[in-house]
Amino acid sequence: MKILAFTAGAAKMYCGSCLRDNALAAELKRQGHDVILLPLYTPTRTDESNVSEPVVLMNGISVCLDQQAAFFRKTHRLLDRLWDAPWMLKLASQTSLEVDPHLLGAMTVSMLRGEDGFQLKEIRKLREWLEHWLWHEPRHELPPDVVTLPNSLLIGLARPIRQALQRPVCCTLQGEEIFLRQLQEPYRRQALELIRAKIHDVDGFVAVSHYSAGYWIRELGIAENHMHVVPLGINLEGYAALERAPHQPFRVGYLARVAPEKGLHVLAESYIRLRRETEFSGAVLQAAGYLAQEHRAYLRGIERHMKDAGFGAEFHYHGELDHARKIEFLNSLDLLSVPCTYDEPKGIFLLEAMAAGVPVVQPRRGAFPEILAQSGGGVLVEPDNPASLADAIYRLWKAPEERAELGRRGAEGVRAHYSVSRMAGRALEAYEKIVASVAHA
């Protein structure tokens, strides 16, 4: 199968969606399929071999400038060449900036308007690139069987892409509802209205969990026969899942982006409860993951809370980890918890932990129940409830045999149900159904 897949760069962050898009493309290539992975906005950053093309479309610098000033919405070839230069994109990707909620909301709405938005010039450049790629590149003598978009925030590109290539377009749904919920009004309402209005520009949708599929069917009114579920899968290379001996000290871990919605503060509060109210001792709380500039004060608050409680020396933040260091970090843990305060539709951090044989403790919300039901590698607790989380951690601390059994089942469950090869097989089935539905329409 020939697949043209777009992926949205996230500047210098290891983005879960980018990792998923890259892993899927790499596995499909390994299986012999012709996959072209095209970055949008910025180059992608992955913790595995990056298989994306060395080009960036819908340049993030131009997209932002087009939003802010009419001057940039006209073609200025010298400036466009400057913004498109690899060194400029690299510089922009490595720069940390405070996020302006107003600009972010307005730009989201403008991008969803597609050719009616302020980014028309960039969309025309995208169409021109695709048409040249289709007709003038010897490598691409045949058009793709299907084109995939990485999320519904880019659904405004579906119509111009379909017009340029005359091929079916599939839209992946992989967590953008969290971003939409955080938009200020009226941008959140406007964005959802635009996505609903454009669902017919897409020939099919792929959700990364059954929870996510149900959410979007209800939210957007997508027909059930247009929705396909392709659960996440991870590359298991490097994950040994060896027999795990208890560590000393006992290590409670967190591996996710450090942000309020991911719930590190909930885990810290649970840890403090355990230390104050039970004989739980000889332990440390270890955290790792990307930290944005706007969330540094949040992390400092957690560090201060741990210190004020008398346990500052038992908390350590390891920063953002590459693939090898991530596996090393997971191998050092006795259990992992990322107690999200929202309905998480993905949970790739659970798959990574369980692949390493680490039992997990998660709130009963979002995709977590289906992942743990399928894998058997952890326990569920009440959402937004530090006491419930503390009770579960305490029970597992007291029961090394149960921890070992959960770790074994989780490692087996991930290998059986959440490998990258399983994800690729399910994705191909979904793409083939979408292509067939268009052919028979």
How should these model regions be labeled?
Residues L37-K125:
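A conserved catalytic-core segment of Leloir-type glycosyltransferases
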Residues Y211, G233:
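Carbohydrate-associated surface elements
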Residues A245-K262, A268-Y271, Q286:
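Conserved donor-binding/catalytic core segment of Leloir-type glycosyltransferases
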Residues V284-E303:
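Glycosyltransferase donor-sugar binding loop
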Residues L299-L321:
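Nucleotide-activated donor-binding/catalytic signature segment of Leloir-type glycosyltransferases, i.e.
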Residues P359-Q362:
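Short hydrophobic beta-strand element within catalytic cores of glycosyltransferases
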Residues Q374, V379-P386, R395-P400:
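Conserved acidic donor-binding segment of nucleotide-sugar-dependent glycosyltransferases
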Residues S388, R395, E402-A416, M423-E429, ...:
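A short, well-ordered alpha-helix in the C-terminal region of glycosyltransferases
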